[in-house]
Amino acid sequence: MNRLAALLVFGLIAACSSSPSAADKDAPARAAPATLPIVIRSAKGTHRFDVEVARTPQEQEKGLMFRKELAADGGMLFPMNPPRTASFWMKDTLIPLDMLFVHTDGTIAFLQANAQPYSRVPVSAGIPVAAVLELRGGRAAELGIAEGDRLAWGGCAVSQEKIATDLNFCPSPAN
């Protein structure tokens, strides 16, 4: 009986410490987050970004916290559906960010340049917005992006590309 118990214990230990299965070995280590194209049309040209989307309240709460870097053409979009007055802070955010608060017509309502890492001071446009876009700090100034410039994303930003998303933002042309 002791021999049988010892074999069972040994078998359980071997099973728990075995190497990953073939399926585990073939799975990607960590899939990169899916991105969404965004185009900003400014007086200085058209600028494309491929950004992550914070859809859920949990994703929006975390945002770009703990990131050590952000690509020049990267960022994060925080869609607000329905539009609402959004307030952001930089708690646990390691890098400066530009925050672009976007009107429902696609124009930039407010641009906070180079928001200070770790700051707990709220940043807001003070009005309901359709989205907030966070870019690498200083990027808006580098590209001449300013309040009043227009954004579109998803299939409306790059209509010639096949985009599988339900997040298409197609503002009406400026009058």
What positions do the PLM features span?
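Sec-dependent signal peptide recognition
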Residues: N2-V9
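Residue-level signal for mature regions of secreted extracellular proteins and peptides
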Residues: V9-F10, I163
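C-terminal motif of bacterial Sec signal peptides marking the signal peptidase cleavage site
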Residues: I13-A15
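Compact, glycine-rich, soluble single-domain proteins
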Residues: S17-N175
